[in-house]
Amino acid sequence: QWRRSLDLQTPPQHTLLSCFGGLHLPLTTPAAEVGHGQWTLLCFGNSFPKTAAIKPLQPPWQPQQLMPLCSRVLTKPGFSTICEALGHGCGVILVERQGFAEAAALQSGVQRHGFHRLISPNQLQVGDWHLSDPLLPPHQGPLDRTGAQTASHHLAQVLMAGVN
């Protein structure tokens, strides 16, 4: 239903979500595959040129609502977005970031546990996103995507044991 309301013409495996949170990067050049209509880019804000393959989004849309519609998420190293993307089974195209305390740990975690591709800020700006290339596989395998449910179940058991 959401695919219809957004008028998405490409299948999920050719739909990309761009999430940069508060970084507000002035992106003007999408990947060639987006420009040629092979991929659809869902993005927040209006920094990209308006084309049929670029869907600018406004609130109330949230990134986690859109991830099930996509195969890949283009993002900076940010804990919440990476967790949501991996939790939804999305591959991550991660823009390398210097000067951010958690960046190295998040980049390493994505490489260990998610299908991924690291790109430089320059590659981001010139549209060199490697969308036609398969993502690199995780070095150690994916994380358990039911971790939140497992933790909630365990917490409920502990609390119930305390009541009895």
Feature map (PLM): residue ranges:
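C-terminal amphipathic helix plus adjacent low-complexity
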Residues: 128-164
